[in-house]
Amino acid sequence: MNEDSIPHNPLGGKTLIVDARDERYYPRPSAALEDAGERDQVYIRPGIYEDKIFVTERSVRLIGAGRDLVQIFSRRGGPLYLQRVFGGRISGITFRYVGSDQHSAINVLDSTCVITQCRAMEGILSGVVLYGPECRATFTDNEVCRNRESGIFVFAGAQPRVSHNRCMENHHFGIAVRDPGSHPELVRNECEANMLSGILLFHHAEALIVDNICRNNQHWGLLMTPDSHPNPVSHELSAANQLQTNPRGAYTISEQPLADIGR
């Protein structure tokens, strides 16, 4: 790979390169991030990396060569944890949890960075968790697939923008939103072939829900509890989204949305 293929750093700092097959470069993304300054970016060349990335109280710029070319996996905990990350961008990486304990592939607490063109898969919990009252992350154009619970779970007062994602073949819901104060923007996501419903809104949660496609899920296109607050209101959701071709129907309101999984 020549220098022309290394992405430009718009911040004007250095680009630290990760390449496990070339001893001139960093062997793991976490090692490069330890040395990265505020204006630096980390670029990950194609490969499979066993690593655990934890970033807190700073911005981050972590760029992979593409989610089909770069995989970061972890056996002991989720491969990506962001805590109070106040800016930056993560893109072009597949995050995969291969352990047996209860962890997610991508964990975002009270952060405001952009995560795009990534993939989150095989979490024992939800693939992606976005949580905390200061969470304003932008999660867009990602694939979230084959996780043991839901694809994307927004809770504990988070208000992220969740758009243009493909959430498929997750064991519970494509996207789930819970708790008072939680108010994501769910826009133009595709929730397909999930084993329960496409989108779940419950326990006093709010959400903007427009232009989403929920199809071929095992239950409903959209499921909500009476205490939830969708925008638009419930009887307008079918017009604002594509909720057809789900066996039980477009949407329903239920006091016990988790009864099918014994909760």
Where are these regions (language model features)?
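Short aromatic-glycine-(Arg/Gly/Cys) micro-motifs in beta-strand/loop hairpins
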Residues: N2-D19
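Acidic Gly/Asp/Thr-rich repetitive segments characteristic of extracellular carbohydrate-active
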Residues: K14-E50
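Extracellular beta-strand repeat scaffolds in secreted/surface proteins
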Residues: D40-I44, L62-G64, L243
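Right-handed parallel beta-helix
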Residues: T94-R161, R166
